[in-house]
Amino acid sequence: LTCLNCPEMFCGKFQICRNGEKICFKKLHQRRPLSRYIRGCADTCPVGYPKEMIECCSTDKCNR
């Protein structure tokens, strides 16, 4: 699996996930519209705090 891993809105950098990591995720804090994204690989979908938006997917570079 290959996931994007840069904080900018339009991301071109990616990483190859390690064995066992089968989820790509994207996290953004909703109260801070200009905040940076957190993207990467995970073994399960991360749990977010209140006001965090988390999207998880399982295909290559799907965490745009």
Swiss-Prot record:
CDD domains: TFP_snake_toxin. Its main location: secreted. Coiled coil: none annotated. Disulfide bonds join C3-C24, C6-C11, C17-C41, C45-C56, C57-C62. Keywords: Disulfide bond, Secreted, Toxin. It comes from the Eukaryota. One of its GO terms (cellular component) is extracellular region. GO terms for molecular function: toxin activity. Transmembrane segments: none annotated. It holds the Pfam family Toxin_cobra-type. InterPro entries: Snake_3FTx (IPR003571), Snake_toxin-like_sf (IPR045860), Snake_toxin_con_site (IPR018354), Toxin_cobra-type (IPR054131). PROSITE patterns: SNAKE_TOXIN. SUPFAM superfamilies: Snake toxin-like. Signal peptide: none annotated. It is found in: Secreted. Expressed by the venom gland. Binds with low affinity to muscular (alpha-1-beta-1-delta-epsilon/CHRNA1-CHRNB1-CHRND-CHRNE) and very low affinity to neuronal (alpha-7/CHRNA7) nicotinic acetylcholine receptor (nAChR). Belongs to the three-finger toxin family. Ancestral subfamily. Orphan group II sub-subfamily. This is Weak toxin CM-9a.
